[in-house]
């Protein structure tokens, strides 16, 4: 077929959160058919997809049968909590997993990505080890030193992560990690706490021909491992960016699957330290909806669909601030939306989650300005005006 002819494709999305919702919207702009799957009804991406289905994605047989039911051209994981064995078997049968099943497996497990990056590729990370029994935790904590981080080997959005200040906090941190662990793995990763100067995300597009395209770096702040705000671009020494690009290229040359990757780094005393990697659009990258000519969701699609990706341009410096719920609500409503939208050059995205919980991310504010500090100030101001409540 002529390369200039684009036929309609069917995409099946595994996980239907807010990032998946934006991916569906961009997919529909290209005339694609989308099936959104998640473990609960009325998930954000389901609200804009052609079809949806609620299943237990951790059950290998259920997941395999559901994917075969829809016969998609591409299977696109958006979350970590799914059966990797199902994806491996489906890939062997000819289904296209984005970016590939091996990459999904490595990046969904903190032990596997650390072993690849630190042990195999010799890239700088925080000191770490794995613990599977609480009895071994105290000894290893003394070796790592306090403060330290304790995380489930598998979780998402920072869930179950604790900053541990002393031995007295280990029991609670262990319990929290176990309670928030996803999948069958119940171990934890114990990690040196790096008192970094700042952290950033390097969105990287991997094309089918192996070429990597880098977006400008995105600054961000997290709380307990969960994204709170981001700004784009981040002012940073070019030598640090060059080092981050070298690290990213080394990792992606090993993983070798097309799509968009969100690669997180720490910087401490002019040293770049690898933090985490996601083989999909990144929460900090939602800022690209207003900051770039091609946002991260469209970049992901173009990459795995093998569509052209011209030069990525910055439209205007921009910032985000998340909208959090302070308690649980069924069918939540949003107070202060009018006041928030009065803030100059500001947009509000409400994700449409059917239930709110304390600390749950329910929306995001996007703000643009030629002065990045003013963009950040406006995003913060608008987000403060919005309160999640119920009737």
UniProtKB/Swiss-Prot annotation:
Pfam families: ATP-grasp, PurT_C, RS_preATP-grasp-like. It catalyses: N(1)-(5-phospho-beta-D-ribosyl)glycinamide + formate + ATP = N(2)-formyl-N(1)-(5-phospho-beta-D-ribosyl)glycinamide + ADP + phosphate + H(+). GO terms for cellular component: cytosol. It comes from the Bacteria. Residues 115-305 form the ATP-grasp domain. The keyword Transcription does not apply. Mg(2+) binds at residues 264, 276. ATP binds at residues 110, 151, 156-161, 191-194, 199. Its EC number is 6.3.1.21. Keywords: ATP-binding, Ligase, Magnesium, Metal-binding, Nucleotide-binding, Purine biosynthesis. Gene3D superfamilies: 3.40.50.20, ATP-grasp fold, A domain, ATP-grasp fold, B domain. SUPFAM superfamilies: Glutathione synthetase ATP-binding domain-like, PreATP-grasp domain, Rudiment single hybrid motif. The keyword Nucleotide-binding applies. One of its GO terms (molecular function) is phosphoribosylglycinamide formyltransferase 2 activity. N(1)-(5-phospho-beta-D-ribosyl)glycinamide binds at residues 18-19, 78, 283, 353, 360-361. NCBIfam families: PRK09288.1 (NF006766), purT (TIGR01142). This is Formate-dependent phosphoribosylglycinamide formyltransferase. It comes from Prochlorococcus marinus (strain MIT 9312).
